[in-house]
Amino acid sequence: MKKISVGIIVFLIVLPMVSMAGTKAATKYPIVLSHGMGANAEVMGITDYWGNIPKTMRNNGAQVFITSGNPMQSKEYKAIEWKAQVQEILAITGAQKINLIGHSDGGLYTRYAISNLGMSPYVASYTSMSSPHRGSPVADAIMNLGTTTGLTDAIAGALDFVYGFLFGVSGTDCEINGTQETTWWMKTVFNPNVPDMAGVYYQSYGADCKTVIGGQVMTALWLAIKPIEGANDGLVSVSSAKWGNYRGTLTGWFGINHLSEIGLLSLPTLGYDAPTHFTKIAADLKARGF
């Protein structure tokens, strides 16, 4: 792991001995992994957000970079941070474009940057993994609770304090972050103003907890969302995750939750391995000429 500048954590893949590395994930353009809400490239300073995914992709020939931004802010704020980091990546590598893979909210602020911040000429492909393109009932419930009790400001303020005091993250705005994850905001404000751009290949994946074994720590949320939006990963429904060319729903043997999609803070998931899955995404992008 190498820091190029403040605000960006980069996995700059150098292959001094190409013969010792695989090439099936050696895409034409660098791969950029962008994290979701509530964390950055490191989760609360405890563990890497992407775990062994970058290493496995590297071992198969990929050049991988990881962007890192404010975990709780508006889409616009995060998009500006992301744009600056991608521009730096392009300058360092000399590449003309990148392949973007975003998990959860990482598939939303990147969409905004591509559509509204002039980044479409620099993005060859866009892949979202369980991104709430049509919002999440979980965000609806949290924001409605705050409105009903009149505690929205207090709850958001407490969360901002936690991020700042306990985890050293400044400049968060949990209230606007939460609002911009609701189904109403995504459907009526975000999507109409964030059109897909010509020249960018869009694809997506979703996931389903499927069983209590797959749900793990997110089982309660999975069960709560199921009657409302059907199959879901404990935060994002399959119907909300679909964008562009939908490549399928990840389930493993017993189900996959929002965290186990990237192997984060979860028990082993039978029938699914996150590093292997992301490497397959890269291999497919390579086959498509990206």
Where are each of the predicted segments found?
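Solvent-exposed loop/turn segments at secondary-structure junctions
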Residues: 36-40, 70-74, 103-108, 131-135, ...
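Active-site catalytic motif of lipid deacylating hydrolases and related acyltransferases
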Residues: 23-98
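Short, solvent-exposed loop/turn and secondary-structure capping segments
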Residues: 42-46, 113, 138-140, 214-216
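Bacterial N-terminal signal peptides
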Residues: 8-16
